[in-house]
């Protein structure tokens, strides 16, 4: 186990290139299972979750070569359809094995997935969609067995716009016989990346970026070369970090077309940034003050399925609000345990009221003091790291494996931006 030792009080700024989106990289890597030809993926972040997925592919017999942020994957055949629970325990995204396996190999046997502790994540929508296509499901001893002799396209309305369920159904449907229509589909940028990658392999997916996808099944997919989009969670985290520490920051290759609503939400906290076709610019001397709603009411910031404000930035919004003059209600609608990390911010001196599992009221500006903190999940971990940079004195962030599940080369990238941080073995 390792920790970060952080010295607070320094400006974070300079120039950085956005990493690839973890939530796009994982399904795109697993989509390589759908062809026996070579798939080349560019801009793949070097993070723990990617390493676990590659370990799974190695274990089943895939050929993988990595050079920097480029992956070459070829899956001529596999040696088994049973996935070791030592892998699935580590990563929630292992659920994305279902679609590719049942589509190309006709069977998968895997344990229920692990991952974050931010709340319950239903699997019902995955099973509904895959079974509508003709798969047969059985469960025993916390293991999932999914089989299909043949998949046939179907029309379906998802009971929730689940990102991973949508991705699983897409990956199963592209090689199914006939047409599939998915209504109430997720349309996040990472879902769009997966669809665009599959189309570059010969799939026929219409409606990309909308909540209705039409998939015309094809008999075979080819190899491809595809570049993963930027990680807008990393970009959002860096915007907060620069603004709260008074730094000036340029984030290159940030895919800012996805930042319209994110920009609006940040502006309600007094954080303003600019962007052009590729880059995001955060200026120093931000006026960090809550903008009240009409009539002088306390503003509410909430999340929802895309294009609403992304749930993965809600933890970042909480720590940001501690450094902004005024009061704001943060309403996490999607996960009932995401807000439980705020006790650690309160320990540092933040003025936060946890109203219930979904809502917190934050009043700023608070003077934070360095402390010893443990990262409960990837996004809360980054929020605590931001708090440590804002705080007076030294902080220790423990369980940094969680942060490194989603953020690439954290220490070196932050040092290059002027941060005082080092990684050490935990006592």
Curated annotation (Swiss-Prot):
UDP-N-acetyl-alpha-D-glucosamine binds at residues 92, 312, 334. This is UDP-N-acetylglucosamine 1-carboxyvinyltransferase. The active site is at residue 116. It comes from Borreliella burgdorferi (strain ATCC 35210 / DSM 4680 / CIP 102532 / B31). Cell wall formation. Adds enolpyruvyl to UDP-N-acetylglucosamine. It catalyses: phosphoenolpyruvate + UDP-N-acetyl-alpha-D-glucosamine = UDP-N-acetyl-3-O-(1-carboxyvinyl)-alpha-D-glucosamine + phosphate. Coiled coil: none annotated. Pathway: Cell wall biogenesis; peptidoglycan biosynthesis. It is an enzyme of class 2 (transferase). Phosphoenolpyruvate binds at residues 22-23. Its main location: cytoplasm. Pfam families: EPSP_synthase. Belongs to the EPSP synthase family. MurA subfamily. GO terms for biological process: cell division; cell wall organization; peptidoglycan biosynthetic process; regulation of cell shape; UDP-N-acetylgalactosamine biosynthetic process. GO terms for molecular function: UDP-N-acetylglucosamine 1-carboxyvinyltransferase activity. Gene3D superfamilies: Enolpyruvate transferase domain. It is found in: Cytoplasm. GO terms for cellular component: cytosol. The keyword Transferase applies. CDD domains: UdpNAET.
């Amino acid at each position: 186990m390792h920790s970060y030792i952080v010295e607070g009080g320094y400006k974070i700024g300079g120039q950085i290139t956005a990493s690839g989106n973890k939530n796009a990289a994982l399904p795109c890597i697993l989509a390589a299972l759908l062809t026996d030809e070579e798939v080349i993926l560019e801009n793949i972040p070097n993070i723990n979750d990617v390493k676990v997925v590659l370990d799974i592919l190695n274990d089943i017999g895939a050929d993988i070569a990595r050079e920097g942020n480029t992956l070459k994957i070829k899956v001529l055949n596999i040696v088994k359809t049973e996935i070791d629970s030592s892998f699935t325990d580590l990563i929630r995204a292992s659920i994305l094995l279902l679609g590719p396996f049942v589509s190309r190999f006709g069977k998968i046997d895997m344990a229920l997935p692990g991952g974050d502790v931010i709340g319950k994540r239903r699997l019902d929508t995955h099973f509904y969609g895959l079974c509508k296509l003709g798969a047969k499901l059985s469960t025993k001893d916390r293991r999932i067995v999914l089989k299909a002799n043949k998949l046939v396209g179907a029309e379906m309305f998802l009971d929730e716009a689940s990102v991973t369920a949508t991705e699983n159904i897409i990956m199963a449907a592209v090689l199914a016989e006939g047409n599939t229509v998915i209504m109430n589909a997720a349309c996040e940028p990472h879902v769009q990346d997966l669809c665009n990658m599959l189309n570059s392999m010969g799939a026929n997916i219409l409606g990309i970026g909308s909540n209705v996808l039409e998939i015309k099944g094809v008999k075979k997919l080819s190899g491809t070369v595809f570049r993963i989009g930027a990680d807008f969670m990393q970009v959002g985290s860096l915007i907060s970090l620069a603004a709260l520490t008074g730094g000036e920051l340029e984030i290159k290759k940030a895919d800012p077309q996805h930042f319209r609503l994110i920009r609006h939400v940040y502006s309600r906290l007094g954080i303003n940034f600019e962007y052009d076709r590729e880059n995001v610019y955060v200026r120093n001397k931000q006026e960090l003050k809550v903008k009240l709603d009409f009539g002088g009411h306390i503003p509410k910031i909430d999340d929802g399925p895309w294009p609403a404000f992304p749930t993965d930035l809600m933890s970042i919004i909480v720590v940001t609000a501690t450094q902004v003059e005024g009061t704001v209600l943060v309403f996490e609608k999607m996960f009932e345990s995401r807000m439980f990390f705020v006790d650690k911010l309160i320990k540092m001196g933040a003025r936060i009221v946890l109203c219930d599992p979904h809502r917190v009221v934050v009043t700023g500006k608070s003077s934070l003091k360095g402390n010893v903190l443990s990262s409960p999940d990837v996004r809360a971990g980054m929020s605590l790291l931001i708090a440590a940079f804002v705080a007076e004195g030294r902080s220790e962030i423990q369980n940094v494996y969680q942060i490194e599940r989603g953020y690439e080369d954290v220490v070196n990238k932050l040092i290059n931006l002027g941060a005082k941080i080092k990684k050490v073995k935990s006592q």
